[in-house]
Each structure stands twice: as C-alpha cells, then as structure tokens.
C-alpha cells in the first residue's frame, strides 16, 4: 500500500507538490539554473539528480520514466541529448545549491540551484597529484634513509677522529712534563 511522504507538503497536497517539482525540474533543465526558496532547492536536488541519472542511461524505458514527470518533450530531448551525455563520466553531484540573500517581501531564505557545468578535471588533477606524491614518497624515504646512513657513517668517522684527537692531546700532555724534565737535566 503506498504511503505518503512524511513532512510538510510543498503546495498543500501531494498532487500539487508533484506539479511543483515537475515545473521546477523542467525550468532547471531548460535554463541550467533557477532561483527558488532554499527548502524547495534542497527538495528538488535528489529529484533532479535521479532524472539526470535516467538520462545518462539513455534507454527508451528511461526516457518514458522521465516523460511521466516532465511533460515538455523539448526539455526531455535536451536532457537526453545534451545533459545526460555531459555527465556520463560523473557519479552523482550534478547540481549545486548556492544560498543567496533572503527574498524582499517575506524574508524567505532563497537559493540558486544550478547544473554543475565544470568537468571533473580538477578532481582528476588532484588524483594524479596524489598518485604521483605517493609514488615519490617511498623514493623520498629511501633517499632519507640513505642520507641517514651516510650521516651515521660520517658521525662514526667523526667520532673516531675526535677520540684520536683527544688521545693525541692526552698523550702530548703526558709527554709534556717529561719533556720539561729532560730539558732541565
């Protein structure tokens, strides 16, 4: 048995809420970005992203599912021909919500919801940089270990030289009184 969603309804009834979201999604796909209240934008996001996921699949069955919601065939064609293929390599996160200043009349919190138009080049660049740094890290550790090994060898040689110098100084210091006595004699 179908159960209604919990929480407040946008527009009062379930049918009006469905109509609101269908109209908001149509406007979003038609214009790329729309300004609406913050709560409607937050509720529209999963609704619109599911439609984009259907468009990515691109089958006739998915097109018919989208046509149940969006009645404008031109918008559905745009969704399947342009928007879906654009996000083919992206796993979710097709929309962005940006909060703006409150509405002047009733001070309602407003937001802009838009389709993300940037490719994920930055995330691919970050991923490549992380892989490169992770490959360089073991090499850097090997260099650090080699430097530490050289440093320990140098420290040992330095310590040996210091010990020899101290022994030489003590030997000359011990020989010095004997040399003075020999001069006096």
Swiss-Prot record:
Keywords: Ribonucleoprotein, Ribosomal protein. The keyword Ribosomal protein applies. It holds the Pfam family Ribosomal_L17. The keyword Cell wall biogenesis/degradation does not apply. GO terms for biological process: translation. One of its GO terms (cellular component) is cytosolic large ribosomal subunit. GO terms for molecular function: structural constituent of ribosome. InterPro entries: Ribosomal_bL17 (IPR000456), Ribosomal_bL17_CS (IPR047859), Ribosomal_bL17_sf (IPR036373). PANTHER family: LARGE RIBOSOMAL SUBUNIT PROTEIN BL17M, RIBOSOMAL PROTEIN L17. Belongs to the bacterial ribosomal protein bL17 family. HAMAP family: Ribosomal_bL17. Part of the 50S ribosomal subunit. Contacts protein L32. This is Large ribosomal subunit protein bL17.
């Amino acid at each position: 048995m179908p159960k209604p969603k919990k929480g407040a309804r946008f527009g009062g009834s379930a049918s009006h809420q469905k109509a609101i979201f269908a109209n908001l999604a149509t406007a979003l796909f038609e214009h790329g970005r729309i300004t609406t209240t913050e709560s409607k934008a937050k509720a529209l996001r999963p609704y619109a992203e599911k439609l984009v996921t259907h468009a990515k699949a691109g089958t006739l069955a998915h097109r018919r599912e989208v046509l149940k919601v969006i009645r404008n065939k031109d918008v559905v064609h745009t969704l399947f021909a342009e928007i879906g293929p654009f996000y083919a390599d992206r796993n979710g996160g097709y929309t962005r919500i940006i909060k703006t200043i409150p509405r002047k009349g009733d001070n309602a919190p407003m937001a802009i919801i838009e389709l993300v138009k940037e490719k994920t080049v930055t995330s691919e660049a970050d991923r490549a940089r992380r892989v490169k740094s992770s490959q360089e890290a073991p090499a850097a550790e090997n260099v650090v270990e080699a430097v530490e090994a050289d440093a320990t060898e140098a420290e040992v040689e330095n310590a040996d030289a210091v010990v020899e110098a101290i022994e030489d100084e003590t030997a000359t210091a011990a020989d010095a009184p004997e040399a003075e006595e020999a001069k006096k004699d």
